[in-house]
From Swiss-Prot:
InterPro entries from the UniProt entry: Poxvirus_I1
Keywords: DNA-binding, Virion
Taxonomic placement: Viruses, Varidnaviria, Bamfordvirae, Nucleocytoviricota, Pokkesviricetes
Keyword Magnesium: no
Name by which UniProt lists this protein: Telomere-binding protein OPG077
Main localization category: virion
UniProt similarity note: Belongs to the orthopoxvirus OPG077 family.
A GO CC annotation given for this chain: virion component
Induction: Expressed in the late phase of the viral replicative cycle.
Further remarks about this protein from its record: Each virion contains approximately 670 molecules of OPG077.
Cell compartments where the protein resides: Virion
Protein source organism: Vaccinia virus (strain Ankara)
Single GO MF descriptor: DNA binding
Function: DNA-binding protein which binds to the hairpin form of the viral telomeric sequence. Required for the production of mature virions (MV).
Length: 312
């Protein structure tokens, strides 16, 4: 750099030296920008109020144990905190009380009885949210305007028709061109949000029949969040260096471990999976299925048959 600066003389600058000087300076700045990790500005968003789970939708023995009966609704963050602070050992492993009182599948219980507590496969505090979510159950009905509506996955059309018949929602004929559009009052939206833990997607209190159908389909679908998953092939464990446990004919690993292992194969700059990883999993994941981590997890695992224990 000194040789370029020496060639810069006031009022007598060589064009070639000037070009070389600025090129070098620009290269330095670019290198600095690439190597420096600039903190991203967080979008300033108003924090949404946390939903309260109706007491009757939380496992009754859990409600009784922690004296939550008189609550107007229980924050999911409170449930998470109670689970983490009362059912785990000091080193973060699920304790014997948790095995008895929390909702575990039969497979999960068998795995816990097979492996050592020090194993990375053992249920730990990283699984708190899954265990806490299992303490709440989906509503089977909701009440509005003096009517009771039952939620059944195979009778959603009947449910929508009944809502229309009772005038709980009204057909908006002006907007109904390609699809039937309904006016849904704020009061009903509040009831659905409270009882079903999510709101329907509306705009100016208008919702299409298709979206309303999809909404009820989602909220009536059983939550099958898994702590352990079955690998399609033992070679997957070798490719991803996963800890596993064999139960009968199936090889299990923790869902969180599999997800983390796949996530680590994503290039931090291109946000795409590494080519070497593609080559390793090509037998199990088609090219059009390499969409994201969740999709790859689905392709590498066998759907679990979930049988819950300790449920009420």
């Amino acid at each position: 750099m000194a040789e370029f600066e020496d060639q810069l003389v006031f009022n007598s600058i060589s064009a070639r030296a000037l070009k070389a000087y600025f090129t070098a300076k620009i290269n330095e700045m670019v290198d600095e920008l690439v190597t420096r990790k600039c903190p991203q500005k967080k979008k300033s968003q108003a924090k949404k109020p946390e939903l309260r789970i109706p007491v009757d939708l939380v496992k009754s023995s859990f409600v009784k144990k922690f004296g939550l009966c008189n609550y107007g609704g229980i924050l999911i963050s409170l449930i998470n905190s109670l689970v983490e602070n009362n059912f785990f050992t000091k080193d973060g492993k699920l304790d014997d009380t948790g095995k008895k009182e929390l909702v575990l599948t039969d497979v999960e219980k068998r795995i816990l009885n097979t492996i050592d507590k020090s194993s990375p496969l053992y249920i730990d505090i990283s699984d708190v949210k899954v265990l806490a979510a299992r303490l709440k159950r989906s509503a089977t009905q909701f009440n509005f305007n003096g009517h009771t509506y039952h939620l059944e996955n195979d009778k959603i059309e009947d449910l929508i028709n009944q809502l229309v018949k009772d005038e709980s929602i009204q057909l908006d004929e002006k907007s109904s061109i390609k699809d039937s559009m309904y006016v849904i009052p704020d009061e009903l939206i509040d009831v659905l949000k409270t009882r079903l833990f999510r709101s329907p997607q509306v705009k100016d209190n208008i919702i299409s029949r298709t979206r309303l159908y999809d909404y009820f389909t989602r909220v009536t679908k059983r939550d099958e969040s898994s702590i352990y998953v079955i690998l399609k092939d033992p070679r997957i464990a070798s490719i991803l260096s996963l800890e596993t446990v064999k139960m009968g004919a199936f090889m299990y690993t923790k869902h969180s471990m599999l997800t983390n292992a796949i996530s680590s194969r994503v290039d931090r700059y291109s946000k795409k999976f590494q080519e070497s990883f593609y080559e390793d999993i090509v037998e199990f994941v088609k090219e059009n299925e390499r969409v994201n981590v969740s999709r790859v997890v689905e392709c590498l695992t066998v759907p679990n048959i979930t049988i819950s224990s300790n449920a009420e």
